[in-house]
Design a protein with these regions (language model features):
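Hydrophobic anchor residue at the start of the ABC signature
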Residues: 169
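Conserved ABC ATPase "signature" region
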Residues: 122, 126, 133-150, 203
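Helix-to-loop junction immediately C-terminal to a conserved catalytic motif
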Residues: 78
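Conserved signature/switch motifs of ABC ATPase nucleotide-binding domains
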Residues: 154-157, 175
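Short coil-to-helix segment of the ABC ATPase nucleotide-binding domain corresponding to the Q-loop/switch region
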Residues: 115-123
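Catalytic Walker B motif of ABC-type/P-loop ATPase nucleotide-binding domains
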Residues: 180-183
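The feature captures the beta-strand-to-loop junction immediately N-terminal to the Walker
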Residues: 63-65
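Conserved ABC transporter NBD signature motif
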Residues: 86-98
């Protein structure tokens, strides 16, 4: 009897060790993805054999020249477009269309002008028919997270560009997605506001632990925000280089002047120019 119990305990211990040693599955995975569009001359390949993985709580940026297919890739991940071949998986489940497991923040302001800040944040929650009390609690929480509690009843026309994007981020996060997708969210902002928003986003990411995939033309922005940077080739877009940033998780804007930051920037720029 004692021997049997020992064997059971040993088996449980071995199973626990195997579970600890098992590789962590990716939160988001893109497998062999390609995308082509029909043209008068036949077809045009925009993306070719894209493969990437994001793990839980990672912040990853994609950089590449205009027209390389970055936005097309993000739209496919969001479920707003279909790939010609390959697949996208979130938590191991195939993406077949838009879903609450992915939040999206666009470059251009996408707030509903007839809704207040609170109502904009609540929009997705109402579509999901979330109970009113839970909606109120979540709205209040994310208003506080993005520092806009005092603007809850304001309309988009009363907000600055940076504040509008904070609301857009809060609206996306309120649905508590597995992955937050960002398509050049600060591209329309002036340089000073852009840097302020970069610091804000980094602090927000540290607070919420959300997994982020962001595309940007700004190499410094990509390095400052992310743990890894993917460099895409010109059309057809392929993954040219993956750079591990290797900077401390807690960062400030002065870090952009550090030798470590400059070295990563050199690698990324060299790859973009090749």
């Amino acid at each position: 009897m004692l021997d049997t119990r020992y064997q059971d305990l040993r088996g449980q211990a071995e199973s626990a060790i195997e579970a600890d040693l098992a590789p962590t599955p990716p939160k988001l995975e893109v497998r062999g993805l390609s995308k082509s569009f029909a043209t008068q001359d036949g077809s045009m390949t925009v993306l070719e054999d894209i493969n990437l993985q994001l793990f839980a709580r990672e912040f990853v940026c994609l950089v590449g020249s205009s027209g390389c297919g970055k936005s097309t890739l993000l739209n496919i991940v969001a479920g707003l477009a279909n790939p010609s071949s390959g697949s996208v998986l979130v938590d191991g489940r195939a993406v077949t269309g838009p879903g609450s497991d992915r939040g999206m923040v666009f470059q251009h302001y996408t707030l509903y002008p007839w809704l207040t800040v609170s109502q904009n944040i609540a929009f997705g929650l109402q579509l999901r028919k979330m109970p009113k009390a839970e909606q109120r609690e979540r709205i209040d929480y994310y208003l506080n997270v993005v520092g806009l509690t005092q603007f809850a009843k304001s309309y988009p026309k009363q907000l600055s560009g940076g504040m509008k994007q904070r609301v857009a981020i809060a609206r996306a996060l309120a649905n508590e997605p597995a992955v937050l997708l960002m398509d050049e969210p600060f591209g329309a902002l002036d340089a000073q506001t852009k840097e302020q928003m970069q610091q804000f986003l980094l602090e927000l990411w540290e607070q919420t632990h959300v997994t982020v995939l962001m595309i940007t033309h700004d190499v410094e922005e990509a390095i400052f925000l992310s743990q890894r940077v993917y460099v895409m080739s010109a059309r057809p877009g392929r993954m040219k280089l993956e750079v591990l940033v290797g900077l401390p998780e807690h960062r400030n804007l002065d870090m952009k002047l550090s030798p470590e930051f400059v070295e990563v920037k050199r690698q990324v720029l060299h790859s973009l120019r090749e």
